[in-house]
Amino acid sequence: MVSFRFPFSFSQPPRATTSFSGFSISAVAVSVTVGAAAAGAAIAASRNPSHPILEWAFSSHRSSLSPWGSITLADESVVEPKTGFSFPASIGDSRRLLGVGLRKKSLLGLKNIDVYAFGVYADCDDVKKLVGDKYANLPASEIRGNKSFMDDLMEADIKMTIRLQIVYGKLNIRSVRNAFQESVGNRLKKFGGSDNDELLQSFTSLFKDEYKIPRNSTIDLTKDPGHVLSVAIEGNHVGSVKSHLLCRSILDLYIGEEPFDKNAREDFLDNAASLAFDN
């Protein structure tokens, strides 16, 4: 028999949460897959009263759990509620999912289309060190609302990944390249002034016309140690650019003051702040 605790909270407005073990899950589905020798379990949270969160079958064992539970996070997934697209709760050795969101785009000013769902991952050891070193004396509620905390997360040499999962089936790589040309270009000007055309080109040129991005395909934007931005399409590395400014500009799109999805940003900050108190 196995026991499991998912440690982070994710939101969907309006927020309706079910709390357990010091954390809450709000309007997302968390699925767990175990091997042939173990039983499978699925856990879902919903505002629909006919589908309440399932009882924890192994609640009597929760007190003995480590902070991450006894099932590896690689076996878990979190669903972005508006699209139904799922994201693994962990990627790599120590990057954990701290927020999920949706990128929308206005089409001819008439309607919004869902372009891609995204998940924001961060190396938990790196985040815990940052929080512990600088914010150890503050409660989590104050850390979350501290603007310098957000700035520190984007400025620090923390390994992070933004995983994009394509929702709009008619999207092509040229559209992605043009969209980043605009959005990342604006952030480069915001943080570094106007003379960054060469840096922007070094990033957008990684999105070559030969790459296909059908619905459900993934694009990973990873900030590696040393402020190196690495890009992977469908798990295949396509190039890297070493630039602190570029990394900051990319992260600002998703967790900055004017993000693509405010709920995703709030979830990310909440969960990042909670890491300091997850012993």
From Swiss-Prot:
- One Pfam family in the UniProt entry: Chalcone_2
**What is this protein's tissue specificity according to the annotation?**
Expressed in developing cotyledons, young seedlings, roots, seeds, embryos, macrospores, preanthesis and tapetum. Restricted to developing and reproductive tissues.
Does the record bear Magnesium in its keywords? no
Tell me which domain of life the UniProt entry assigns to the organism this sequence originates from: Eukaryota
The yes or no answer to whether the keyword Repeat is present is no
Explain what the UniProt record notes about the effect of disrupting the gene for this protein: No visible phenotype during vegetative growth, but shorter siliques containing a reduced number of viable seeds. Elevated total fatty-acid levels in leaves and seeds of plants grown at 15 and 22 degrees Celsius.
N-terminal signal peptide? none
> What's a single GO CC term here?
chloroplast envelope
> MF terms per GO, please?
fatty acid binding; intramolecular lyase activity
Where is dodecanoate annotated to bind? Answer: 103, 116, 183
The residue ranges crossing the membrane are none
The primary site where this protein sits is plastid
Query: Where would you find this protein in the cell?
Result: Plastid, Chloroplast stroma
What Gene3D superfamilies does the record point to? 1.10.890.20, 3.50.70.10
Alphabetical UniProt keywords: Chloroplast, Plastid
Q: What is any one GO biological process for this UniProt entry? A: fatty acid metabolic process
Family from the record: Belongs to the chalcone isomerase family.
Q: What does this protein do?
A: Fatty-acid-binding protein. Interacts preferentially with saturated fatty acid. May be involved in alpha-linolenic (C18:3) metabolism.
Q: What name goes with this protein?
A: Fatty-acid-binding protein 1
Task: Identify the gene encoding this protein.
Answer: FAP1
